[in-house]
Each structure stands twice: as structure tokens, then as C-alpha cells.
Amino acid sequence: MVPENTLHALEHTVENNFTHFETDLRMTKDGEIILNHDATIDRTTHEKGNISELNWKDLKKINAGSKFYERKDLNRKTSFVLLKEALSIFDKLCFNLDLKESGMAEKVYKIIKETNAEDRTLVSSFSPSRLDEFIELSNGEILTSGSFRENVIARYLPTKNRNFRIQALQAPFIYRGLKVHSRKLKEFCEINNLYLHIWTVNNDEDFDKCLEFGCDGIMTDEPLKLRKYLERNS
């Protein structure tokens, strides 16, 4: 495939006519919001350092996919991407944005507003406090998705209407060996008027299970494989 959360990944998404892109957000030392999963650049590049301790002017010079390209024996470069660039350049894509750190909610909200991306973004976070902060700032103007807190409630209070302020629930297919996906989880979402998105699902057998209990969205590292599966089973 392509190196995650990079310009190459965005280009690949558009070239293959996909409409949605899930990514994670980190903040640089100088306050820029970039697309990246990890707190450091160690795993994906041949450089080292915490993103929170690096300025954007230095990060943008780094080959963001160097380790991926090395594994694939490819002589290629790609770059990290600012959130504001992703939303403005790829203005037909819908984005699922995961707030990975505290202190970025206001910046993310302003960027979404400035790029007129309110109707094509969904903001999520594993941290209830980060998500609550964003919901307060956006006042429901931008779609949000719950995760850990809402999954716990769904597990132990499955028949209750909880009057959530979110519009979707994102749940893992399996978490630490525990099966999370289920028809009961879908029923909980229906009771609470929530869309259900399941992550991370990468093979046909698990695609089958997701569709059997009626999830509304599948997050995958293998979008081409998922597309072929859907074409075969449409």
C-alpha cells in the first residue's frame, strides 16, 4: 500500500476514488497540527524525535515514509501533512480526525472552519475530556464520535438511552482479545441514534461479520481489499 498519514497516502486515496480518510492528529512545537499517529517520528522515518519538540519547518524536510519505502525497496520520498493543507487541497475527501493530544481542540476546530470542512469531517478521540472540549467549542456544528467511554456504557448498560452528544460510536473489532463487535452493540447504537463504525478490519471473514450485524462503517488498512469484497458481495 502506502506510508500511513502522509501526502502519498492522501494522493493514493484520491487516485483510487475513495471518499473517506481516517487519520490522527498531533501538534508540533510551534503549534501546527499535522497528520500522524505516533507521538514520535521514530517508527516511520529514519529520524528520531517527539513531534511536540520539533518545529514544522524541520518536520517538512523529513521523508515521512522512508522506512516504508525501504521495506518495499522503493526510491521515493513523501512528506508529513498539515491538517489545514489536507482539508484545503483534498477538498472532496471526508475526514475522520482522531485528537491524539490535549490542547489541540480549539486549533482543530478553527482549521475545520477556515477550510469550510464542517460538513465533511468527523472528530473523535479516545480521551473523553478531549472530545468533550471539542464538542463544547463546536456546539454540535461538527460531527463527533465517541470511543472508550461510550463503549463501556454500551457494554454494561446496553438497553439504556443515554442521550449522547455524539453522532457515532467507533469500536474495535477485537480489543485485547475481547470481542467487542456484536449485534447487541449495534442495537445499543440504534437505541441511541448513533452510527456504528468498526476498526480495524482487514480480511474477508471479518468483513462478513461486520456486515452481518449491520455496522455503518468499516475502518481498514486494506481499502482495495475491502472494495473487492464489496464488489463480490453486492
Task: Describe each PLM feature range.
Residues 1-234:
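Phosphate-group recognition and catalysis centered on beta-loop-alpha active-site segments
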